């Protein structure tokens, strides 16, 4: 009688482990990665919103796609798809009075974190909203996304 329960318990445990059921350590790792992503996005936003940025009005003319719904880590696929355009806009805006240090490194860091968080198996097709967003709106929405996910993990 107990043997069947033990075998069921072992089978369930193996199923959970193989399906990468979240553990407290993986939750903590996810939270740390989200915090790093949040800081990188905030650093870019702060650089853009710097009062000395003469190219802000030009940067606001570029539009970015936002997902209709971004509530899960797998939705980071949509952020990943917009990283190249983001990098291009940031590079266009570089000047003597406005310079984001290591734009390429920041975008690379964001890309690495996003890939780790969403997982390599994600084949989500992003459903984008009808309206596009400015660079400031884009960054603010992804910052809010990170904060929202972090709050659910704590």
From Swiss-Prot:
The keyword Magnesium does not apply. The keyword Disulfide bond applies. Glycans are attached at residue 23. Transmembrane segments: none annotated. GO terms for cellular component: extracellular space. It holds the Pfam family IL2. Its main location: secreted. InterPro entries: 4_helix_cytokine-like_core, IL-2, IL-2_CS. Residues 1-20 form the signal peptide. GO terms for biological process: adaptive immune response. Keywords: Adaptive immunity, Cytokine, Disulfide bond, Glycoprotein, Growth factor, Immunity, Secreted, Signal. GO terms for molecular function: cytokine activity; growth factor activity; interleukin-2 receptor binding. Disulfide bonds join 78-126. It comes from the Eukaryota. It is found in: Secreted. Belongs to the IL-2 family. PANTHER family: INTERLEUKIN-2 (PTHR48487:SF1). Cytokine produced by activated CD4-positive helper T-cells and to a lesser extend activated CD8-positive T-cells and natural killer (NK) cells that plays pivotal roles in the immune response and tolerance. Binds to a receptor complex composed of either the high-affinity trimeric IL-2R (IL2RA/CD25, IL2RB/CD122 and IL2RG/CD132) or the low-affinity dimeric IL-2R (IL2RB and IL2RG). Interaction with the receptor leads to oligomerization and conformation changes in the IL-2R subunits resulting in downstream signaling starting with phosphorylation of JAK1 and JAK3. This is Interleukin-2. It comes from Macaca fascicularis (Crab-eating macaque). The lineage of its organism: Eukaryota, Metazoa, Chordata, Craniata, Vertebrata.
């Amino acid at each position: 009688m107990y043997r069947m329960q033990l075998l069921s318990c072992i089978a369930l445990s193996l199923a959970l482990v193989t399906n990468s059921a979240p553990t407290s350590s993986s939750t903590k790792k996810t939270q740390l990665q989200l915090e790093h992503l949040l800081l990188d996005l905030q650093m870019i936003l702060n650089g853009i919103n710097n009062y000395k940025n003469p190219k802000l009005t030009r940067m606001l003319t570029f539009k970015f796609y936002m997902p209709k719904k971004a509530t899960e880590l797998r939705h980071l696929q949509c952020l990943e798809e917009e990283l190249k355009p983001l990098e291009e806009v940031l590079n266009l805006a570089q000047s003597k009075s406005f310079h984001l240090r290591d734009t390429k490194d920041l975008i690379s860091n964001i890309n690495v974190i996003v890939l780790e968080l969403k997982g390599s198996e994600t084949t989500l097709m992003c459903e984008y909203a009808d309206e596009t967003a400015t660079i400031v709106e884009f960054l603010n929405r992804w910052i809010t996304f990170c904060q929202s996910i972090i709050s659910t993990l704590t």
